[in-house]
A protein has these predicted regions:
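Fe(II)/2-oxoglutarate oxygenase catalytic core
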Residues: 1-46, 51-80, 86, 92-152
Length: 152
């Protein structure tokens, strides 16, 4: 998660409980929230940490709209889903049981999602290299891109 999100600041977490009929319509989150000291946090990445075991409720999927189509998530308790905050998302109606989640937002060192994804891909390639000149050049490229794209 750290190499994909590159967090520099976190919002305060929020907790949500959805019972039967509970849902949250498709929306986009605020561009800025505040941390525990009242300082603004640019919301580059949203996260949902699932606290209820998926077997204890029906419905209540996290719906994320993606250019490739809608994706629904109902992972096991303790799992988190991260996605770019600007993507439309919502929660489908709960039909049985209770859905408990923790949600929050991350300000990334790298503002743009496409740049974060490119860096993540390069680091995955780098992790498969044994070393040598090619690995050094890849490390240099990743570092230079971070200096070029990184913000505080």
């Amino acid at each position: 998660m750290r190499s994909w999100a590159r967090p520099v600041r976190w919002s305060l977490p929020m907790f949500a409980r959805y019972g039967p009929g509970g849902h949250y319509g498709v929306h986009t989150d605020n561009a800025v929230v505040h941390d525990e000291n009242g300082w603004p946090v640019r919301t580059d990445i949203s996260f949902t940490l699932f606290l209820s075991d998926a077997a204890t409720y029906d419905g209540g999927a996290l719906l994320v709209r993606d250019p490739a189509g809608d994706r629904e998530f109902r992972p096991e308790a303790g799992s988190a889903v991260l996605y770019p905050t600007g993507q439309l998302h919502g929660v489908t109606p709960v039909t049985r049981g209770e859905r408990l989640v923790c949600v929050g937002w991350i300000q990334s060192l790298v503002r743009r999602a496409d740049q974060r994804e490119l860096l993540f891909d390069l680091e995955r390639v780098r992790s498969g290299m044994d070393g040598g000149e090619a690995a050094l050049l890849m490390d240099m490229a990743i570092g230079n891109l971070l200096r070029m794209w990184g913000e505080d």
